[in-house]
Amino acid sequence: MKFIVKLYPEIMMKSKPVRMRFTKMLETNIRNVLKKVDEDAKVQRQWDRIWVKVPNDKPELAQAFGERLACIPGIAHVVQVDEYSFTSVDDIYQQVLPVYRDQIAGKTFCVRVKRTGSHDFNSIEVERYVGGGLNQFTDAIGVRLKNPEVTVNLEIEGDKLYMVTKRIEGLGGFPMATQEDVLSLISGGFDSGVSSYQFIKKGARTHYCFFNLGGAQHEIGVKQVAYHLWKTYGESHKVKFVSVPFEPVVAEILEKIDNGQMGVVLKRMMMRTAARIAERMGIQAIVTGESLGQVSSQTLTNLNVIDRCTDMLILRPLIAMDKQDIINECRRIGTEDFAKSMPEYCGVISQKPTVKAVLAKVEAEETKFSEDLIDRIVEQAVVIDIREIAEQMNTRITETETVVAIDTNEVVIDIRAPEEEENKPLEIEGVEIKRIPFFKLATQFADLDKQKTYLLYCERGVMSKLQALYLIEQGYHNVKVYRP
């Protein structure tokens, strides 16, 4: 069994050297991701496609491979195929007939063929011959070229016939690391998750910068969002997570800054700090989730004033998106439930925030800050490899027990994603198992029986530890991590 990976059309339009570079990078990215599923995964690049072979002795990996390929930037779509050899057009028909006989019975159908290589026939001739045979020697209702109930998709390359058994839509965009790195300001809400995702999809290695306005609970939640985005869409490359202790800045704003200017000043301080951090990391652009007119600091006038605080390029991919469209995209990429349960820290709220800030007035207010404030904040920032989140959580989960055995009155919660849980169902004799995906746990845990203890389970133990710490920070102490 094989997958044929089709390149995103924008890649196909590039010049030959650029197209070759992009295709090589996509091949490497696919290999990096699939090797984590199975070491025997085979990936082979051609000019206009990439082949992925599922090991013959492990057909059950097909679903896992397909799910991972669907989340790798740079792919238009993927087709899962079964491979056959043929000697003639009639031989093609004879091999297609037993496969599709039952599938097209009582239905309309059509045959579509894509062909590469030198043959004594063309694609249309194969479509007519195979379609005519299926129409005559099966119980199909007939051929319908527009909107058929079943489409028989065939691909021919040399003397090989590939019958398409499944088509999987890809992300599109460019392969990861074909564009330069960016630093995304992430709060864990609806907007910042989507803006981060859009740059991952565009092929930029996206690092994360979190401004902690107070509370370990918020930082844990944001790390879950960042880890989910990286693990799902950007796992082929290492990225950094930067946590900036911003409480001192908030304290000085509340104490020294004019009430109406607080929101704009806070954003300018964030941009200055992020720019300094980005420069240290060799990054030339900052990404934010700001959308025009969404809040008072996001008017054109205020955004212009905010941008004047640094020479660093500030990118706002959501600038013209409606809030509902952002939420819909958030739901599609799997961060909606995180955003819904994210704690809000509104320490800097102006009574009458200005929507038309004056640069000179804002700069005058900023002279009231301590001279070394930004320097201190940047020095205190904690930078970690996003893959180290699990190890970091291990040192912090002092209130949470990790268990290998299950006692009475304990319930196991399988927090894996639905596809992963379906692939490898967790079954423990005599034990109650609830299935709540990690991205829904924060909103559903409060409804569970508080008299019972809950053991969180996931494959590698990373997300279960994050979720356990998050729940403990919310005040739940009837939770442990299950590692059989």
Curated annotation (Swiss-Prot):
GO cellular component: cytosol
Entries under Gene3D superfamilies matching the protein: 3.30.2130.30, HUPs (3.40.50.620), Rhodanese-like domain (3.40.250.10)
Rhodanese domain mapped to chain residues: 406-484
Primary location group: cytoplasm
Alphabetical UniProt keywords: ATP-binding, Cytoplasm, Disulfide bond, Nucleotide-binding, Redox-active center, RNA-binding, Thiamine biosynthesis, Transferase, tRNA-binding
Molecular-function GO term, any one: tRNA-uracil-4 sulfurtransferase activity
Reaction(s) the record says it catalyses: [ThiI sulfur-carrier protein]-S-sulfanyl-L-cysteine + a uridine in tRNA + 2 reduced [2Fe-2S]-[ferredoxin] + ATP + H(+) = [ThiI sulfur-carrier protein]-L-cysteine + a 4-thiouridine in tRNA + 2 oxidized [2Fe-2S]-[ferredoxin] + AMP + diphosphate; [ThiS sulfur-carrier protein]-C-terminal Gly-Gly-AMP + S-sulfanyl-L-cysteinyl-[cysteine desulfurase] + AH2 = [ThiS sulfur-carrier protein]-C-terminal-Gly-aminoethanethioate + L-cysteinyl-[cysteine desulfurase] + A + AMP + 2 H(+)
EC code: 2.8.1.4
Record domain THUMP: where: 63-167
A matching Pfam family: ThiI
Compartment(s) where it occurs, according to its Swiss-Prot or TrEMBL record: Cytoplasm
Involved pathway(s): Cofactor biosynthesis; thiamine diphosphate biosynthesis
Family per similarity comment: Belongs to the ThiI family.
Free-text function comment from the UniProt entry: Catalyzes the ATP-dependent transfer of a sulfur to tRNA to produce 4-thiouridine in position 8 of tRNAs, which functions as a near-UV photosensor. Also catalyzes the transfer of sulfur to the sulfur carrier protein ThiS, forming ThiS-thiocarboxylate. This is a step in the synthesis of thiazole, in the thiamine biosynthesis pathway. The sulfur is donated as persulfide by IscS.
Record NCBIfam families: ThiI_C_thiazole, tRNA uracil 4-sulfurtransferase ThiI
Name of the protein described by the UniProt record: tRNA sulfurtransferase
Organism: Shewanella sp. (strain MR-4)
Gene (UniProt): thiI
